[in-house]
Amino acid sequence: MSAMSSRINQSLAFLNNLRKIPLDEQSVDCLFSSKSFKAELLTQIEKAKYRIYLTALYLESDEAGSDILMALYAAKKANPALNIIVCIDYHRAQRGLIGEKKATSTNASWYQEIEKAQGLGVKIIGIPVKRKELFGVQHLKGFIFDEQILYSGASFNNIYLHQEERYRYDRYWLIHNVKLADSMVSFLNKEIISSGAVARLNTDVITPMSELKAAHKKLTRNLKQARFEYEGERTSDCLAVTPLCGLGTRNNKLNKTIRKLLQSAQQEIVIFTPYFNLPTAIERDIGALLKRGVKLSIVVGDKTANDFYIPKDKPFRTIGALPYLYETNLKRFATKHQKMLQSGQLKLNLWLHDQNSFHLKGLYVDNRFMMLTGHNLNPRAWRLDVENGLLIDDPKQQLKPLIDKESQQIFANTLLITDPSQLQGVNNYPDHVKKIIVRMRRTKADRIVKGII
């Protein structure tokens, strides 16, 4: 047996031996637009009988965020026994938007106002994954309503929920399964909500970070070792799901599983990522799978579909150079693998639809495995943020109609790149962007930026 075959077999054995929760084909569904995502959220909130757990990066104090929060309060008022917990990032909730000089109010101050007026006990929990937001955030995903999971990388604001003209496109999968829902709720209760390092964000006084320091070390240590608890089966012949999580580079089960998916591939992989900024390990695995003849399609947002992109008619800020930096990464990658790009073995698909933005993440592997995750496949997700994912094993391709429909929807707004020259380079960029990138390269600051953003 060759070393290549051995690596493939070892990786497949790892994936086959993961403990899985069997799924009924009828219990899985997919939504195909941000508008239907918002409608589904509101429906599920209204229908929930005993628990609602929402995990996201943030809940914004805008019209769409208000629709969600007020729906939660209405549900609690109608059913006081309903347990409602929203888990978001502690730091993100207490600052203004990027670029705001001084925030007069924050999301947290809005939560406090609403709770003061309503007084119903909807709990909004802030999770400080690291002491500073720059070095790691709460990036767990998933919304649980009784026994129903709605999994998406989206947060709650006008653009994610398509409140106005613009939308931010994500993935939206529904799974009805008691074991999976219980496991996800148990994880949140045991690892996060019961921790002394988290703080209620809608009480009169929010515990400052200085008072959370001692408990915070324990939280970080625990999250690095945390696992979902459930009774699973080591099966490889039926539709099933494995919940995964990870924080940091050591013993990170989610990162390890992503690598095993790439290393196990024999026919075809599709990767979705909003920012083309791959960790070294992923780049290496991609190089190896291309070398062994696996077809690879990467769907990535055009620089103008990046949530950091600043339109030309708006005042420019340094953070607006990021989408250009990611495009230089993509151009370098396309140049490195030019032969495979031109032969069609490698397909780079740039997503662009009007003024909308792209936030999809995940993988399809060999028409069998599908990874749903908030993991951006970038160094930040690899090393700094706490992440989770749902690995769906579909050996009989029972979800193929849904996956095909989702793919069709995604690829409808993509441009196929067949040559690196189709991508702009530094020389094509506006002068103010060019200066920033050249200066960053000269001081090697671009490496630091790529590692943390």
Indicate where each model-derived feature is located.
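Short, catalytically relevant binding-site loops at active-site mouths
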Residues: 276-278, 303-306, 378
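Gly/serine-rich nucleotide phosphate-binding loop at the start of the catalytic core
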Residues: 58
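C-terminal, well-structured subdomains that either form a transmembrane helix-short loop-helix hairpin
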Residues: 265, 271-286, 359-374
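HKD-type phospholipase D/PLD-like phosphodiesterase module
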Residues: 11-13, 17-47, 62-265, 304-363, ...
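Generic beta-strand/beta-sheet core signal
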Residues: 55, 87, 145, 152, ...
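Long, C-terminal catalytic modules of enzymes
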Residues: 340-453
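Residues at the starts of beta-strands that form the adenosine-phosphate
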Residues: 81-85, 268, 291-297
